[in-house]
Amino acid sequence: MRYAKRPVVTALASVLLAAGLAHAKVSEEEAATLGTERHPFGAEKGANADGSIPEWTPKWLGLPPGLDYAGPGETRPNPYADEKPILVITAQNYKEHAENLSEGQQALFERYPEYRILVYPTRRDFDVNERIKERVKWNAVHTEVSNGVETLKNYNGGMAFPIPTGVPELMWNMRTANCYESYHVAYDGYGVFANGERAHDAVDFWQSNPFNNPANPVGTTEAVVGDYIVWTFSERLAPQSTKGQMTVVQDPMDFKNHKRNAWTYDPGTRRVRKAPAIGYD
């Protein structure tokens, strides 16, 4: 019986893909709802039925008043530092909330009686700068998918499809959700095993999206910016066995006519090599 489901799933996926290709762009009138009836990225502005997701109230843009942030390397301030949790889930009451907990979270309560989850109110208080709003609104009426799901066309930065109509748009939204021009972060963490052993992993990570360059006027597309939507550089800082390894990746916006470019540097051999095995996971 399980094999009989495959044609149905395949047929449904085909219909969804076809629907997405047929309705990639929206009207000027519908795009005008972005920032008014909708969040600038397309989400509903109002609260959901039970109030667990509140209304979007764009009262802040950037650093909220009264808070200090010295910049990269410093801890970001918490605008809700005085807020108290509305619920504390413990090993004693977690089964009452099982429908909202993953299997892993439930297992933690079983194994570690002192484990707790503090639940705070959801907030939607931050706004989006006007340049990004205009880019996303422009995309809504101009950007489209072609060549199945492989090619993004007439894109000018920001989220590609704020009002998606099918699966291809949702896929491209995952690739264009970050609206920064450049991004730099150092990931540093430990994986802790059940026996208490720890695995240290640290990466210095840079990413650039040339389409989000503020110097590009709204409506500047791949015809000017070029065929690559994201550039990524990473360097391994830990563990010691991989320290110094570097990776550079270029992601195209047209996967039909351009491949992902990737190179790695191995400090052991002091060689740079193409890395076709770096895939899309």
Can you describe what each PLM-predicted range is?
Residues R2-H23:
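Gram-negative bacterial Sec-dependent N-terminal signal peptides
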Residues A24-K25, R270:
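N-terminal charge/polar-biased segments
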Residues P267-G268, R273-D281:
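Short, His- and charge-rich active-site/binding loops that engage polyanionic ligands
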